[in-house]
């Protein structure tokens, strides 16, 4: 029987790396994996993991692919010697963290280019053949940040919300062509993402008013204490296999059910008020913003007390609403920089 040909983007670290090695080393030896990276200079950890797991010869091939470049996508597609991709995994992603007004527009555009347009470029390149063959699976690494808005992650959440709409729309159409699309909704995941977050091009915190800067600094302090609750990427990769092997795959698979109560809150109250109030309460309830404060006024409350609860985007730290609803925890965004942006 022919191997299942899988192409995965964003395999330099994290979920992409672990999924590529997990499939290539599977006992069934039924997968041929094309693990793609934006820059082949970053393939060292992937090669090391493949050797450690004993991936059989020919089970894993590493390709250069930059999801921001249609020509790069086409070149990688041409390198697939089987002439087909049975499972496409859109995993490459970029994060941006900080007050919205502090972000450079080119940093905002970079996030949207990778997370949204990059996924669209991959779909445009590989969907036509899947539809012609009446066979194929598309798995997209999604996020709790695509199901609910979170402060200081406005741009990241906007990009992930876009993926939800994109994939849900395709999920209605594609079964007519024998193709299925699934979103793997991740919570907090232990990855190297927080080590890749950087300031500089992400923006200048000084652009934000003093009150917003105070809230942001307060908000960041909860990451360290929340990191311990994050899932391991190996655990999350098994969910991808579940979606790949399901006879009739679902649109969404959740790596944790801890944030589902808030997701339900958004649908049960279409006005959005219940969710907004709950998130505001959990994120900022220990800070009392002075009524009628002038621009630059101080915010009362203990500046050394982190928010009561935090959660994390897959590979990107975000606030969480947990104390009452049981969400999962988060990654730490590395050094104390004003804004953060992930390199891919």
Swiss-Prot record:
InterPro entries: 17beta_DH, NAD(P)-bd_dom_sf, Sc_DH/Rdtase_CS, SDR_fam. Keywords: Cytoplasm, Lipid biosynthesis, Lipid metabolism, NAD, Oxidoreductase, Steroid biosynthesis. Pathway: Steroid biosynthesis; estrogen biosynthesis. One of its GO terms (biological process) is lipid metabolic process. It catalyses: 17beta-estradiol + NAD(+) = estrone + NADH + H(+); 17beta-estradiol + NADP(+) = estrone + NADPH + H(+). It is found in: Cytoplasm. Substrate binds at residue 143. One of its GO terms (molecular function) is NADP+ binding. NAD(+) binds at residues 3-32. It comes from the Eukaryota. The active site is at 156 (proton acceptor). It holds the Pfam family adh_short. Belongs to the short-chain dehydrogenases/reductases (SDR) family. Homodimer. This is Estradiol 17-beta-dehydrogenase 1. It comes from Rattus norvegicus (Rat). The gene is Hsd17b1.
């Amino acid at each position: 029987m022919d191997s299942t040909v899988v192409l995965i983007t964003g395999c330099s670290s994290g979920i992409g790396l672990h999924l590529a090695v997990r499939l290539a080393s599977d006992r069934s030896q039924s997968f041929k994996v094309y693990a793609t990276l934006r820059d082949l200079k970053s393939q060292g950890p992937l090669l090391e993991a493949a050797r450690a797991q004993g991936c059989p010869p020919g089970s894993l091939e590493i390709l250069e692919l930059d999801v921001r470049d249609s020509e790069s996508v086409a070149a990688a597609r041409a390198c697939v010697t089987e002439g087909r991709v049975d499972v496409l995994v859109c995993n490459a992603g970029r994060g941006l963290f900080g007050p919205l007004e502090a972000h450079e527009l080119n940093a905002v555009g970079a996030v949207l280019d990778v997370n949204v347009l990059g996924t669209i470029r991959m779909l445009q390149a590989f969907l036509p053949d899947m539809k012609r063959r009446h066979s194929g699976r598309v798995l997209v690494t999604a996020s709790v940040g695509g199901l609910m808005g979170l402060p200081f992650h406005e741009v990241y959440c906007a990009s992930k919300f876009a993926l939800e709409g994109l994939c849900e729309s395709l999920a209605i159409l594609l079964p007519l062509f024998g193709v299925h699309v699934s979103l793997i909704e991740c919570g907090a995941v232990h990855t190297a993402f927080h080590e890749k977050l950087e300031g500089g091009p992400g923006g200048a915190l000084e652009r934000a008013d003093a009150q917003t800067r105070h809230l942001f600094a307060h908000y960041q302090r909860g990451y360290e204490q929340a990191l311990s609750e994050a899932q391991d990427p190996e655990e999350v990769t098994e969910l991808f296999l579940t979606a790949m092997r399901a006879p009739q795959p679902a649109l969404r698979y959740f790596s944790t059910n801890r944030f589902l109560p808030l997701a339900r809150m958004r649908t049960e109250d279409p006005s959005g008020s219940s969710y907004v109030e709950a998130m505001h309460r959990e994120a900022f309830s220990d800070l009392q913003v002075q009524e009628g404060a002038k621009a630059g006024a101080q915010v009362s409350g203990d500046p050394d007390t982190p928010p009561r609860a935090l959660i994390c985007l897959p590979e990107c730290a975000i606030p969480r609403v947990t104390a009452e609803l049981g969400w999962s925890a988060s990654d730490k965004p590395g050094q104390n920089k004003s804004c953060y942006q992930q390199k891919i």
